[in-house]
């Protein structure tokens, strides 16, 4: 049977290996396919990854680096489930990821190993362990729930499938196990069926199973079926069965009877068995797929066999249902993903004809709506109808495939059946059956509705429409409209009968719905007519409708202006305004006219509305001058101002300030330019200065920045309006810092009598010119002096103020200023009054009136400057008596006492309130000792130092410095720059410190000397204190300081101090001595204080005497000392001595350093002793490892063997690696053998030349790297047998193959390498690389075997690589074959042509040429054949005919002079009508004088130079050639040349035919004259008939009569008269019919107008027809009334409705 006619269609959806997936990963354990959407492949090399193949985009696989033991893609969504075993346990870790969201959904750690898992639903995972089955939902946080335990029959089975039914009530688990002993090749299948409701299991034998749903006749609920296939042996007999069984039968309902059928396996497939089963719910078929690729197809309902075939030559291990196509996907071991589907066009004919199962064929066709059973269904229907089984016939018709019987004929057949009384009519039975099955078609819906409407059962129609049982149509709507308009509207909408829907909405006055509906369906109603209709009854509704039109996509269908005019013609101003305001919101330039219009109509009728519109500012494109004029006329002066653009207009309108709100006018000023605004302000002041001043001031204040403050000031000054200036500058003052503005404001306020404001500004402002203001106020002589007082007080003009007030006899203001305003300035006032020679009594009274508020210091300064200090004695004593502690009071009093020499020492020592620095300074020139007293009392260090230095009072200075104990003071006096430092130090050492008994004072002095870096002076000081039996001789700190200072300043004294002093800090001082490199002193200190470790460190680290250190260590015998000695010996390279010292110290802490040093010194014997000591103290891997290494270095291998058998913590792997690296191979062998590191052992044995043992170890290691190392070593040693054993284990790894090959080739072992590769071909894991590499080797070294190898294994070769090898080795024939196999046809063709002696084969080249992509190769092939194989060139050209440019081919052949060679080719392609081909063939035909072929060519192919050919043929010697020339002229329209040529050759018939075809009357009549002239009467008669349509009758008769040829013209004359009379009769008949039609049309129009006028009184006034609508003019006497059509009024009576349910549209 041909594949095209097979009932099952197979195709290869994709190949996994083509996506880069290695063949070793195409297995059951690596590939999963849970549905038709995704394939998931788990790769483990070169790295762990998961490849997800989306079947919708198979060429774009998603590869992610994921390590897992198994991966499953969710059947529906991009959710990935991963399973991985936890290392070291039998537990599995499960994770679920959302790939799109890149988030983890859930994870769980299973306590058992999951041996199989599967998505049983899109939300549920089934997990199978060794003992149980769990379900795990991806929703929520639930953990896997146990469902049931595995039965015993599944023990030791490999689980291959797990499924559940759609209700998740039935579960089935499938496993396979090795076959029975008598037939081990046949695998056993076991199945466990579990009921969730009953919690029971049943064990069965089956290899594959699946669930299905099936509706049994008489049962509305579907039955759950299980289908399973088994293949068992019993007593040597093989039984293969398919079972279909119902699960959970429904009580009281018809059930599904159990079915079973045999599976027939061909003899060659006796050991084959089912591996998968898929059920197609779409077709009701069962697919059983076996391991070896057999497909069995069975009917689900009957278990009848439908089809069997082998679909795959390779074993199938995985399938998945394809619900979309009703088939399935299968994956075989080759990586092919096969897609099997039912062939809709052939399965039913196949079942009916091949299987002769007519019932099954009909059921399949009905079940899946398939073609092919038409005759059977129709025949069965007719039989049932003939048997009056109307119900069965109705059911058959309802279920007929592809609606075969759902036709009007079937309805008519049921209608024709007579109805028996008391019985349901067959037609209703038919419709009832259809309704239970689904939806009726349009015709059925219409017929059923007729019945229902006639019976007045409208509710049935409503129910059926609600249930979507009827197909809506316009005819159905028309029918229902007679009983229910609403229901009819719904039907029209569903049927998309747009005109009827619009008419219905118009009748219901739901105009808004018309717009919505029209937009939805893309219909365009008559919007203008609808708007006019609404206007008559609902003006607001009309506005809403117009607005809805304006919002339609694509713009408003009616012009806005037209809509506005409709409103205005009915005086609907408000409605027109509302419409325009809404549609003009976008404020577009093209709406300028409408903006002007809406403003005009409202300014005339409703100015307040216009004002509101303008206030909103929503328009900006209207005619502003026009609107401005209208606003002025309407009294809207502000709006007029806003719209005028000329200054005179603005001035004219602005003076109407009485009608303009002041604030608005002020705001208007903000829109004017600076110059215009100032002009307008000037006009306002000119017209009414007093009335408009406030507006002008407000405008000036508001826009001062734009107008300029100076300009505004000048404006007010121009009108001498100080009031305007006052108000204007008052607002601007707070933000201005201009002194001139502040002064002008003060001036304006003063001139307008605003004294309080003048006082406030002078008090608060910081920006006026004080000098200028002071002068103005003094000149103004205001009655109130407070403004002047403010200015002078703030800006320091107090003397001027005092002088002004004193000279103007304003003493009251002086007292007020001093007492109340600013008592602090009283000293200045007093000073000025003294200068003005004011009486002392007034001044004293003034001072006493202020008293404590008066600042004493400046007052004293003022009086002191004028030598009037005694004036203050009474005042100061009064303050003291009042208890004043003011320092200035007491300073002044002290100065008076010092000057009067009234016991000043008593005052200086007892008065606590004076300032020592001030009084001391006052005393310096009078008595320095008094100054010292004052400075000491106030601790005035600098002043005291200066005065004592100046007066050589160093003893006083030394005592003061020691007593002060101030570090800063000490630093100051001990500075090198101090020229008196030596005198001070002498007084300190000799007098001040010896007198002191305070340790603090001593300490401060010592510290000061140290800080000042005076070590020698400090030693002098300390010796005097410490060594001379003073109170501080035994002081610990001073002894430390003395030694440390000596270390720093005089090291020669240190040893003496160390010996003489005992109470100092030995460790610290010793460290300082070390730092100062006084090593012997430091050793003496440490030894004195028994610090042995520090002492020995000095000997080792500083003195560097290991001998003295050893001697010292023997003397003290301390472990710590020996340890220090050992470390020093180690540093100096005395390794053996260091090891002995470490052993004496019993110190194991530095074993790493000891090991390193011992290895460098190669003293492994001593190291062994040390390490044995260390092992007694610590268990360190490093120690044990080094001990083994040391044993190896001194060749104590037996000790190594003994040691590793003992408990140890050595890292033997690392030790072995180190031994190997150090080439201690015998010791390394012991270690590697002990730890079973076969890989390293193998390499070690190689180094020992023990190759056989190395191979054995490599076999145990089974590592690619190890195999390579052993292999390469064997090759180098020419142990090729062993090398081949290793090589076979390497070359199965793709990545290592090339390395092995190169190694062999580099050493010239070509034969051995070929032998290795040939052996590798038979390996189970042989891959493409082996076959390819062997091909490359054949190409290089055995070319005679190359072609055989390529042909045998072409599908398993890496062809590009082999192509390169063949190209390099110049094997052209093999290279061509490879190019063809790789679909590189361009390269194949090029190779054949370039190397034709070796590679050319005609048949092969033809096959290649038709597949070439590069067009230029076609023409290269033509040249090639022309040069080397001209006899075969036509064969090649015919093959390439569809791809060649025939013009170019002809040019090639023409240039080569070989056109005749390709004549067969040109004939074959001439049908393309190519100019070059036609001309070449015509040229050959002319050359061969083949006029028949030439005529045929010219006739059929017109694309050539016709005139050129004609001119060439015109002179040909053959007549037929010249006739062809005439013929060509005729075809080209050159009638005269054609006729002349025919006349020349006496071809009169040709002449006549040419004239007839030309349509030229003159040529025809000239030809008649020619025939008369030649006496050709018969030709004359023939020409009259042939040119009948061209020749005029009068000309013909005239020529005949004049030349006595009337008899020859008479037949023409008879024909002409007959034709003429027939035409006249036709014209008369047409005229009569036309007149009748006109009269009938006029009568019809008259009747229509009369009928329309019957309703004229019911219709409101309407606008005249818009231009272009083509309506008739209004009737007489009623201007503006259109004809009465088109207003939505249907005609009365039962007459037929016009189209679309609307009357003729009349004017609209």
Curated annotation (Swiss-Prot):
Keywords: Coated pit, Cytoplasmic vesicle, Membrane, Repeat. Residues 1-492 are annotated as: Globular terminal domain. Residues 537-1708 are annotated as: Heavy chain arm. InterPro entries: ARM-type_fold, CHCR, Clathrin_H-chain/VPS_repeat, Clathrin_H-chain_linker_core, Clathrin_H-chain_N, Clathrin_H-chain_propeller_rpt, Clathrin_heavy_chain, TPR-like_helical_dom_sf. Residues 315-343 are annotated as: WD40-like repeat 7. Residues 156-205 are annotated as: WD40-like repeat 4. The keyword Membrane applies. GO terms for biological process: intracellular protein transport; receptor-mediated endocytosis. Residues 25-67 are annotated as: WD40-like repeat 1. One of its GO terms (cellular component) is clathrin complex. Residues 537-648 are annotated as: Distal segment. Residues 271-314 are annotated as: WD40-like repeat 6. Residues 653-1708 are annotated as: Proximal segment. Residues 462-478 are annotated as: Binding site for the uncoating ATPase, involved in lattice disassembly. The C-terminal third of the heavy chains forms the hub of the triskelion. This region contains the trimerization domain and the light-chain binding domain involved in the assembly of the clathrin lattice. The N-terminal seven-bladed beta-propeller is formed by WD40-like repeats, and projects inward from the polyhedral outer clathrin coat. It constitutes a major protein-protein interaction node. Belongs to the clathrin heavy chain family. Clathrin is the major protein of the polyhedral coat of coated pits and vesicles. Clathrin triskelions, composed of 3 heavy chains and 3 light chains, are the basic subunits of the clathrin coat. This is Clathrin heavy chain 1. It comes from Oryza sativa subsp. japonica (Rice).
